[in-house]
Amino acid sequence: MPKKKPTPIQLNPNPEGTAVNGTPTAETNLEALQKKLEELELDEQQRKRLEAFLTQKQKVGELKDDDFEKVSELGAGNGGVVFKVSHKPTSLIMARKLIHLEIKPAIRNQIIRELQVLHECNSPYIVGFYGAFYSDGEISICMEHMDGGSLDQVLKKAGKIPEKILGKVSIAVIKGLTYLREKHKIMHRDVKPSNILVNSRGEIKLCDFGVSGQLIDSMANSFVGTRSYMSPERLQGTHYSVQSDIWSMGLSLVEMAIGRYPIPPPDAKELELIFGCSVERDPASSELAPRPRPPGRPISSYGPDSRPPMAIFELLDYIVNEPPPKLPSGVFGAEFQDFVNKCLVKNPAERADLKQLMVHSFIKQSELEEVDFAGWLCSTMGLKQPSTPTHAAGV
């Protein structure tokens, strides 16, 4: 069915003319924003939601530490802690990420300045941004609160995420990455399940992408992790591009499909435990069993893997030097397997790009499928479903 021409987005200028986090809210700004939003080919529901978010945001004004009240902790990681907070002047619920950094004022100001680009990132596939400020040794990044949490939290509850649900996730991630690249010349740099957020309306959005080079540099030493979603070319320190984000998406999809970080790959015994039936190993991957490792390694995955876990340096060596992970045959559709294989090609020049992935048969099939993403998420996470969930035909 051809898309009908979207109605123009209606945004009311802020009546008091106050600045939103230091940005003037003149009519000219609103007209420019309206024009940008009209280029996005949104459906009616997406348009209304973006419009509602931006109208709410106009009421917020300048963000200050005193205006927030903590509701609960949402999670920690990526060098910071995220809280669910109430913005007292407007009663809006937000997610506030606090990043503690020992840095000079000039660097701090540069980070806040660079984060202002987030004000222009308005897409149904990108988490909404209210503003960023500095207070008491911490940078605060205030975002839209997504009540379903991140996909790593959903995965822990669900055990495994069904292929049809992952089809909707794939569409949203590709559209989010395409938006960042085409409209803002931004790479994400950190695609993984914990940076894909979902809500009870059935929306799927990317967060924590690399808009601030200075923030990335300032946090470079804060990586403490037992798993890596980085592409082989990035781990080797060679030039990397948005192709690196595609590897990370592919690895994340395999993890969510099998229920555990996929390196080293599960053996036949573990696959049987995961899927409750005998699973065919891909004939080509029969020799891919990881080299035996000494016991007592720090944990690097969860799931019923009886083998000793890998140390982080072994894991990184495995990503660079061993064949990429695959979805096991006989459990997943051929299109899904092929889609993941095209994301997980070690040579970035041979890896599928965003345009190719968007027209892949797995995506085309997923766009046509009626999937109640909101219903599945709400029953998995014990959430109350709102009255107007997103009808995720094409997300």
From Swiss-Prot:
Entry superkingdom: Eukaryota
Positions of post-translational Phosphoserine modification: S218, S222
Molecular function GO terms recorded: ATP binding; MAP kinase kinase activity; protein serine kinase activity; protein serine/threonine kinase activity; protein tyrosine kinase activity
EC identifiers of the protein: 2.7.12.2
Active-site residues, record numbering mapped to chain: D190
Record key words, sorted: ATP-binding, Cytoplasm, Cytoskeleton, Kinase, Nucleotide-binding, Nucleus, Phosphoprotein, Serine/threonine-protein kinase, Transferase, Tyrosine-protein kinase
Positions of the UniProt region annotated as Disordered: 1-24, 284-305
GO annotations of cellular component type: centrosome; early endosome; focal adhesion; late endosome; mitochondrion; nucleus
Recorded family membership: Belongs to the protein kinase superfamily. STE Ser/Thr protein kinase family. MAP kinase kinase subfamily.
Its job: Dual specificity protein kinase which acts as an essential component of the MAP kinase signal transduction pathway. Binding of extracellular ligands such as growth factors, cytokines and hormones to their cell-surface receptors activates the MAPK/ERK cascade, ultimately leading to phosphorylation of a threonine and a tyrosine residue in a Thr-Glu-Tyr sequence located in MAP kinases.
The protein, known as: Dual specificity mitogen-activated protein kinase kinase 1
Name of the coding gene: map2k1
